[in-house]
């Protein structure tokens, strides 16, 4: 059965900055030995940093070698189609955000044998035009906006203009987090988004908010790492939620209320001496955590 494919994202569209670290990593794999990766768009820079640190290859070269099939498709392909002992087919290690519920159900029905662990923390963030005077919204105000109960910015301290609320498709990792962290913790009500307000990829959502004809009226969401370091756009800014502005510090201490972890995943039967298992285990070491932080993410213990 052929693999499913989503929007294939690559770092050519998502440049990542890396801060040099005083602790020089010790390579433990060759470039050819490094496991095949897949996962979420927002994890591309981390995958590149992992490959550079684990093999000693140049970071820019590592960036050009990473492509992903995006969150839902990565989980499906990995859990339903690929095998740990395949030498030339499918990913061997995922670096990925949480799977959508329907994918979790598919994996459970297939009795997929996967092993996963949290390696980092990110956050769901809300994006508005910098001309919008609203600086912070409560979680309940956000729920009411996306349920269609609040329809004007004047009801949350802004201008007397309609709120244009963008969403993502059901396959996206950010839509999964949006539902889990916000909508499902309320009454679960979510208005349907017309196609033009549900771009296929995160870059498209950011572009749409920036370019919308009445852009000061628009609101959308992403994960913090993507909007902060991979696809920042002039004229946009992040909202505080419950008065807390998202940032590495407020995500690390979880004072920002909409945080969630992301994962490394291997097949449960991956051999102890396999490259994917070596990298999976390495992510728990001090050097592995430094790699995560060097790439700009928040590592978890």
Please describe what each predicted stretch is:
Residues 15-301:
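Exported/periplasmic ABC-transporter solute-binding proteins
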Residues 6-11:
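Bacterial Sec signal peptide processing site at the extreme N-terminus
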């Amino acid at each position: 059965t052929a693999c499913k494919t989503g929007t294939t994202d690559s770092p050519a569209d998502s440049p990542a900055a890396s801060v040099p670290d005083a602790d020089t990593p010790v390579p433990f794999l060759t470039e050819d030995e490094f496991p095949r990766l897949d996962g979420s768009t927002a994890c591309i820079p981390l995958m590149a940093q992992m490959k550079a640190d684990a093999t000693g290859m140049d970071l820019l070269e590592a960036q050009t070698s990473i492509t992903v099939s995006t969150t839902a498709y990565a989980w499906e392909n990995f859990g339903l189609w690929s095998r740990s002992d395949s030498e030339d087919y499918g990913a061997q290690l995922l670096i990925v955000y949480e799977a959508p519920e329907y994918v979790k159900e598919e994996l459970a029905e297939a009795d997929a044998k996967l092993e996963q662990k949290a390696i980092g923390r990110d956050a769901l963030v809300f994006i508005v035009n910098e001309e919008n005077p609203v600086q912070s919204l409560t979680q309940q105000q956000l729920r009411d906006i996306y349920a269609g109960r609040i329809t004007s910015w004047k009801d949350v301290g802004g201008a007397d203009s309609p709120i244009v609320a963008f969403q993502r498709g059901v396959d996206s990792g950010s839509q999964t987090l949006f539902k889990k962290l916000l909508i499902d913790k309320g009454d679960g009500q979510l208005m349907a988004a017309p196609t033009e307000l549900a771009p296929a990829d995160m870059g498209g959502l950011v572009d749409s908010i920036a370019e919308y004809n009445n852009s000061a009226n628009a609101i959308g969401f992403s994960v913090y790492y993507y909007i902060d370091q991979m696809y920042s756009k002039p004229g946009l800014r992040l909202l505080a939620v419950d008065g807390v502005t998202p940032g590495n510090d407020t995500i690390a201490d979880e004072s920002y209320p909409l945080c969630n972890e992301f994962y490394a995943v291997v097949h449960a039967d991956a051999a102890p001496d396999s490259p994917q298992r070596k990298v999976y285990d390495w992510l728990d070491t001090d050097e592995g955590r430094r790699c995560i932080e060097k790439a700009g993410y928040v590592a978890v213990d």
